Amino acid sequence: MSDQDKFIQMVLSSGPQFQKLLQVIGRESGLSEDLRIVFQKLESSTLPVSDLVVKNIFESERANYDWVSYELKPLGVGTMAQVHRAKVRMNGKIKSVVVRFLKPGIEKRVYEDKRILSEIAPILDSNHVYLASGLPKLTPLVEDLSKTIIAELDLKATVDRQNMGYRVYRGSKTVDLGGYKNILKIQVPQVYWPTTPTKLMVQDMVFGKKLEKVSQQYESVLPKMKKAVAELVAEVWIEEVLFKSGFFHSDLHQGNFMVEFREDETKVNLIDFGMGGQISSTTQGAALALGVAVELLKPETITESLWDLSEQAHNLLLKTQFRALVDAKVLNIKHGLESGVKVEDWVAWAIQKGIKFPFIFISLNRGFGIINNMLKEAGSSHTLATISKKVGLKYALNIAKDLVDNESVTAKELVKLGLGIKKVPARCENIFMK
């Protein structure tokens, strides 16, 4: 057995939180090709539960669902859940559906994993060798990861998020796929939730393949398909979270949307709403102010925005102390001692310094990175910066009013950034500038 295979077996024998952590790392940019291949193998090597367990799960739900048939072989297997094809009778009609359930016993493993990692993290954080390595503190990372994993245990919350996605993630656009025009249509499968308690999530069967496979299949005749799909998904996502309801899917990597190509219309089905949420208009405004402040390297507004976004009562330092740290960091950037950083980097840095952000904002921050990485993997020349600028053209007046009225920046500073009324949406570019 090769060292690579040994590593994979070791990870598969570990707890769900550690596996999830490695999956997140595997989706980050900057990994070597060897590591990328290892993480891809890990994601495709997750073991399913036995056929007998699957059968018992389906049969125990007959009071909720009138099964016509179901497949014991899983359609897909994840760290915590798996999905199966089935047919169910509803209102006298037979529907093809996909059934998702959490693996039996996974909740116990999640909390056991949390206990172990929570004990190990502070020990490593205080180890002089680890401290000298310059690596980030593990304790806040473990806390955030635990919240993410535990949130996925709430099946009803996942259903609620998918129902929200079903309502708001709608968009279609005629695009050039490379010498061929086609309509791209974004949609989310409908969920069927019974009135009595259930452990299953039953949703419409959607067809299609992962974007990578579809784009490879049609690469010779539709060379721009991969980029076009990724860019439309990013447009719909960023418009909803920044300019509309504030709702977001925080894990929209390429594995979480299925593409069904047809000559007249290509359907892009967004799936797996285990992670996500909805931010308030106040959070939207604070995030926008932070983005502009980061671009201006304006320490007072960076401090105010990060502090406003945080759980202030739980921060481990005073606001004056945090302001001093921000001042020093800005000075280092201006003197070339540190490279310029994005909003996501400022948030990660603040966490390491003891700022406590609500889980919803951390989840959103992760979503920013996932979308940016998705665009990069698709070979798009766009980033969230340029996508946001394009989408923001519809909201120019509101953007200008919010930023100036909240005294986050002055009108003169907006002009300095090229953010006159006609150009205000460019502020989105400043938020996600790389």
PLM feature segments, named:
Residues 1-249, 254, 258-285, 290-434:
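Broad phosphate/nucleotide-binding scaffolds in NTP-utilizing and phosphate-metabolizing enzymes
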